[in-house]
Swiss-Prot record:
Superkingdom: Bacteria
Database matches in NCBIfam families: L3_bact (TIGR03625)
UniProt xrefs under SUPFAM superfamilies: Translation proteins
Name of the protein: Large ribosomal subunit protein uL3
GO CC terms in record: cytosolic large ribosomal subunit
Self-association and partners: Part of the 50S ribosomal subunit. Forms a cluster with proteins L14 and L19.
GO molecular function, one term: structural constituent of ribosome
Stated role: One of the primary rRNA binding proteins, it binds directly near the 3'-end of the 23S rRNA, where it nucleates assembly of the 50S subunit.
The UniProt record lists the keyword RNA-binding: yes
Keyword line: Ribonucleoprotein, Ribosomal protein, RNA-binding, rRNA-binding
Pfam families cross-referenced by the UniProt entry: Ribosomal_L3
Gene behind this protein: rplC
InterPro entries according to UniProt: Ribosomal_uL3, Ribosomal_uL3_bac/org-type, Ribosomal_uL3_CS, Transl_B-barrel_sf
Length: 218
């Protein structure tokens, strides 16, 4: 595992706005309501074979929680939460069950990775889904302006190779945006202001973690 200390929190994407930096330049940011989360389980190398911390986020009516989940929350001594996620860490001994996790953990962090589920676009063609150029607008083109074009060879190999980029379902995928600059941490309102766009719809669940590629504290 990397030497970087990985910290993570669950949150909800609220939308985008803009702020001004120290040089009065406009910076587009995504506002994420991150936490407060609560630790529901701590995994150690001795008992589980790896180090991780399980955190829970979001309110939910206890009547809507199934019995296995309700028992898990009861064992941890916390009220039921809507979302649960596990964050791999280098050393989980600094966490304990019932502990609150807030945006304060990112006070000294400059870059983060954000994981979310992208907007679903439904069935999309090659131009929208993969950025294909399409075909000529005139010069003999007839009803093929947005078609994909050739998808392979002839009798040899006599098939379409796996992974060929074609039309199909687009979006609704779990993706991670890496090395996004953390513009501001608002501890009072439990908000993270992240430069640029992050995956998903407004109100969607996101996981914000310390950037793994070495630039987190740059």
């Amino acid at each position: 595992m990397s030497d970087i200390e990985i910290k993570g929190i669950l949150g909800k994407k609220l939308g985008m706005t803009q702020i001004f930096d120290e040089e009065n330049r406009v910076v587009p940011v995504t506002v994420v309501e991150a936490g407060p989360c609560v630790v529901t389980q701590v995994r150690s190398k001795e008992t589980d074979g790896y180090e991780a911390v399980q955190i829970a986020f979001g309110e939910i009516d206890p009547r809507k929680v199934n019995k296995p989940a309700a028992g898990h929350f009861k064992k941890a001594g916390v009220t039921p939460r809507r979302h649960v996620a596990e964050i791999r860490v280098a050393d989980a001994s600094s966490y304990e069950v019932g502990q609150d996790v807030t945006v304060d953990i990112f006070n000294d962090v400059k870059f983060v990775d954000v994981t979310g589920t992208t907007k679903g676009k439904g069935y999309a063609g090659g131009m929208k889904r993969h950025g294909f150029a399409g075909q000529g607008a005139a010069h003999g083109n007839q009803a093929a302006h947005r078609r994909v074009g050739s998808i392979g060879q002839a009798a040899t190999p006599g098939r379409v190779f796996k992974g060929k980029r074609m039309a199909g379902r687009m979006g609704n995928d779990r993706v991670t945006q890496q090395n996004l600059k953390l513009a501001k941490v608002d501890a009072e309102s439990n908000l993270l202001l992240i430069k640029g766009a992050v995956p998903g719809v407004n109100g969607g669940l996101v996981v914000v973690k310390t950037a793994v590629k070495g630039g987190a504290h740059a």
